[in-house]
């Protein structure tokens, strides 16, 4: 579907009762949204998982990290480099089911014969669908200043009626070296807008519809044959065509990356990243008085408006030190802080009974349900979510044969009780590249052979921030402390003053290999994970609680398994096997 989101999976089991999502890091900006990018602006995608992910990005990396690097400017000697690409596609209706004809339906006496011959599945197909993509990039730069900017337009039509998405946007990546290379500034701005027209035609219903009925009626006002009071048979074509749906997604993301090279101490620098992301969603819907739902409910039109906004703020600052010592020793150390904050708000309104259909949702206050006190309205502000951490990590290698790394993070989350917000997490890994040993020099067919072992402890706070907020709600029956019910405004959440971090302990043993000048390569891993203090919403009695559930730390889970990947220049095979068991207490 044109409106389908991007789904990414990293093969890990992290929680028993929910799915953790991977953190997206775009050009060093954690918490990015891959849907804000176009594939032509992506330079590379890398994946981190297990201990390596937690060591760098902390608890938000519980399910792994997807690192995305976008294209940037280069030294073109001041000349402008222009690149244009396009793509045109048409989708086919594959795997269409075989439908009964009107004559076959009538012969089986399944239902009333209305005299038509309609393939309802085929009627929902947009046979004239056409999709196109255009991408224009401009690049120029010198040794000290480089700029990359791009613009794109995409129109994607699905095979279903009223299924379309149009995207356009652009981005600017720049890099400037100042003060004799003491300071490097890398600003970036990204904007994307996606307009959606999605009615999600009911193909399942199309397979149940009576094929002797026609979707069209030339004598009706709309040209469609609309009937009601038959729950198992209705005009799916009219439902899709008569509803007005317009959704608009907007992403705006400016960020600045500052790197200060401290020249009196070679190899030492300080880097500061500040980023802001604003995502807005607007939805406009209108069902006219001729729509089946309005006829069935004796209404004259239904208008719906919705708006939501999410703001992400990220700030990271860290010192890094890189030094190559005599004898093949190498050290890479980093220490700093990380801050992440999320805010959001939303609004929605429904109104009914309009004097005319043509104005649709643009004058939503004119529906009679508003003056009658029956219109639906809602608004809200999400609980502010904050994550703050201090971290340090070090990597050591000797002659690219022996490798050690260690990290520690002191992390605090606003999602937990005040006494349990801060926790310490750490990891350590070791590696041995056997292929670089002197006794392996005679094995010419061996390119790389490395054994690695790692152990790490990370936390998880992947749940709604509302569980630790004193949320209030209205228009609801509340259980009072004395055991009686009252229709009032009151607490909608049972706060747990003892809620704490979910903690994952993991060790991993793996082998990486490459043979015959890279023609055959792969890896093998054995892992074992134990998750303690699992976070789960459990049922609680009323009273003394005002609500029937509360988020608690309830138990533990253990998983272990094997995974392997074998690849050649043309083919790749992957196999995994894992066993998981849990215990609660």
Please give the residue ranges for each predicted region.
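Short, small/polar-rich motifs associated with maturation and membrane association
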Residues: 1-172, 177-178, 183-186, 192
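Extracellular/periplasmic, surface-exposed regions of secreted and cell-surface proteins
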Residues: 21-23, 173-179, 188-193, 201-204, ...
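Flexible glycine/acidic-rich beta-alpha junction loops that bind and position SAM and/or redox cofactors
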Residues: 197
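Non-catalytic nucleic-acid substrate-recognition regions in nucleic-acid-modifying enzymes
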Residues: 213
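A eukaryote-biased signal for short, well-structured alpha-helical docking elements
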Residues: 217-220
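The feature captures the catalytic groove of carbohydrate-active enzymes
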Residues: 295
């Amino acid at each position: 579907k044109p409106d389908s989101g991007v789904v990414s999976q990293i093969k890990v089991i992290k929680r028993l009762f929910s799915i953790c999502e991977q953190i997206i890091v775009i050009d060093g900006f954690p918490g990015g949204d891959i849907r804000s990018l176009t594939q032509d602006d992506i330079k590379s995608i890398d994946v981190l998982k297990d201990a390596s992910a937690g060591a760098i990005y902390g608890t938000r990396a519980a399910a792994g990290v997807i690192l995305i690097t976008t294209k940037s400017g280069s030294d073109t000697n001041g000349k402008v480099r222009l690149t244009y690409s396009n793509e045109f596609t048409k989708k086919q209706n594959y795997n269409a089911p075989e439908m009964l004809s009107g004559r076959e339906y009538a012969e089986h006496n399944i239902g009333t014969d209305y005299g038509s011959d309609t393939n309802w599945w085929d009627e929902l197909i947009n046979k004239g669908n056409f999709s196109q993509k255009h991408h224009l990039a401009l690049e120029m730069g010198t040794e000290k200043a480089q700029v990359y900017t791009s613009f794109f337009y995409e129109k994607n039509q699905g095979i279903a009626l009223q299924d379309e998405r149009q995207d356009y946007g652009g981005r600017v990546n720049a890099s400037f070296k100042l003060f004799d290379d003491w300071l490097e500034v890398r600003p970036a701005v990204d904007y994307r807008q996606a307009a959606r027209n999605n009615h999600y035609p009911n193909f399942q219903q199309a397979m149940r519809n009576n094929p002797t009925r026609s979707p069209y009626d030339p004598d009706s006002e709309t040209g469609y044959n609309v009937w009601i009071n038959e729950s198992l048979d209705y005009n799916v074509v009219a439902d899709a065509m008569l509803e007005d749906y317009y959704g608009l997604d907007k992403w705006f993301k400016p960020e600045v990356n500052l790197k200060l090279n401290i020249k009196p101490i070679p190899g030492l620098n300080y880097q500061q990243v500040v980023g802001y992301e604003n995502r807005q969603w607007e939805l406009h819907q209108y069902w006219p008085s001729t729509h089946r739902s309005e006829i069935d409910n004796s209404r004259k039109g239904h208008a719906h408006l919705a708006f939501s906004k999410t703001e992400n703020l990220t700030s990271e600052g860290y010192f890094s030190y890189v030094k190559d010592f005599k004898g093949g020793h190498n050290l890479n150390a980093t220490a700093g802080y990380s801050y992440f904050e999320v805010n959001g708000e939303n609004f929605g309104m429904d109104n009914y009974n309009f004097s005319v259909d043509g104005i649709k949702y643009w004058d939503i206050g004119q529906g009679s349900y508003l003056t009658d006190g029956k219109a639906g309205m809602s608004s809200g502000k999400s609980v502010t979510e904050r994550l703050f951490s201090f971290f340090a990590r070090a990597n050591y290698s000797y002659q690219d044969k022996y490798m050690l790394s260690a990290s520690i993070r002191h992390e605090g989350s606003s999602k937990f009780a005040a006494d349990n917000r801060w926790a310490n997490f750490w990891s350590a890994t070791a590696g041995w590249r056997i292929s670089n040993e002197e006794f392996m020099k005679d094995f010419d067919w061996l390119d790389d052979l490395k054994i690695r072992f790692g152990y790490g402890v990370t936390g998880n706070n992947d749940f709604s921030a509302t569980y630790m907020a004193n949320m209030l709600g209205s228009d609801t029956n509340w259980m009072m402390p004395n055991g009686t019910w009252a229709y009032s405004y009151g607490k909608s959440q049972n706060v747990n003053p003892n809620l704490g971090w979910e903690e994952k302990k993991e060790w991993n043993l793996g082998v990486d290999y490459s043979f015959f000048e890279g023609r055959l390569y792969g890896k093998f891993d054995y892992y074992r994970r134990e998750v303690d203090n699992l976070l789960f919403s459990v049922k609680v009695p009323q009273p003394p609680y005002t609500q029937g559930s509360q988020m608690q730390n309830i138990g533990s889970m253990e998983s272990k398994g094997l995974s392997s990947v074998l690849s050649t220049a043309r083919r790749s095979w992957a196999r995994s096997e894992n066993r998981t068991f849990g215990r609660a207490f």
